[in-house]
Amino acid sequence: MAATEGVGEAAQGGEPGQPAQPPPQPHPPPPQQQHKEEMAAEAGEAVASPMDDGFVSLDSPSYVLYRDRAEWADIDPVPQNDGPNPVVQIIYSDKFRDVYDYFRAVLQRDERSERAFKLTRDAIELNAANYTVWHFRRVLLKSLQKDLHEEMNYITAIIEEQPKNYQVWHHRRVLVEWLRDPSQELEFIADILNQDAKNYHAWQHRQWVIQEFKLWDNELQYVDQLLKEDVRNNSVWNQRYFVISNTTGYNDRAVLEREVQYTLEMIKLVPHNESAWNYLKGILQDRGLSKYPNLLNQLLDLQPSHSSPYLIAFLVDIYEDMLENQCDNKEDILNKALELCEILAKEKDTIRKEYWRYIGRSLQSKHSTENDSPTNVQQ
């Protein structure tokens, strides 16, 4: 693929591959730009940084298309190549086409200059999901020895506007890797999660930061706080599992008992929400649901006052685990499981009645005796 491909409005994905041929040497800044900077220096004027407030937004009335700028006269814009017979061709705005035609040109030349860096900002303003622009911007950050702390401020502002964009979070991650400074990250992510506590981009970044820089301290307390605010948030339950799995683990009986009882208390608050039930099943399933001491009795005690499809389904899972492990009273346990499957099918989870009847038939087929097959599951 040519270096200029994949930079249209809809381009997304991972980092672009290395070119087949060695890249050309970076072009120096054009004479017009160099002369302008020299004149400004002689006059004692500061040359504006691309991150200065003086940056002209594309929405500004004073914005000038690149093709009309004298300092870009040395560049031949490279149009997007949609092939000889494009189908359903995207109609780009004149401004979008202008910016990306010039971006393709500097990318093709591998021009590592201040003007190319400023151009990436315009391209990002038009489409912050374009991975090629972000990649080239990072090349320029290194080549031009830009202030990475300023770049962190820049990406912070963009993420606050577009918090569900893969490319902006990846750019931030690379900056944190370069700086080896995670000091702002947990607070920043918490601010983003305050806007949407289920933003998986933010959670993914948080997990990476914590794991990369060993920031495990206080994370479980943070999770506790979020669960108190919204016990239904499956993302927070996932974070709880992530933290404990990577710290104490669940093999310590005291940790496991704490988590089981913690989860049961949360279930009492919202018995009809699946998140806590999934967590409970996740931490016990590999150990055997029926083998955890007194869990069955605790759930049976909950059933009269906190009955829900999830509680009954969990009981079915426990009974199935008992059957798989060759329990003594096999026929009695099987009948209890079949009865619960029928309750789910007829009363508690009717939208999945065929599923529960299938589960019942499967249990019956696998675990009933040949001479005395239970008949309380409808066909």
From Swiss-Prot:
PFTA repeats lie at residues 112-146, 147-180, 181-215, 216-249, 255-289. Its cofactor is Mg(2+). InterPro entries: Prenyl_trans_a. GO terms for biological process: peptide pheromone maturation; positive regulation of Rac protein signal transduction; positive regulation of skeletal muscle acetylcholine-gated channel clustering; protein farnesylation; protein geranylgeranylation; regulation of microtubule-based movement; skeletal muscle acetylcholine-gated channel clustering; transforming growth factor beta receptor signaling pathway. Pfam families: PPTA (PF01239). One of its GO terms (cellular component) is plasma membrane. Residues 19-32 have a biased composition (Pro residues). Changing residue 199 to K: Reduced catalytic efficiency. Heterodimer of FNTA and FNTB (farnesyltransferase). Heterodimer of FNTA and PGGT1B (geranylgeranyltransferase). This is Protein farnesyltransferase/geranylgeranyltransferase type-1 subunit alpha.
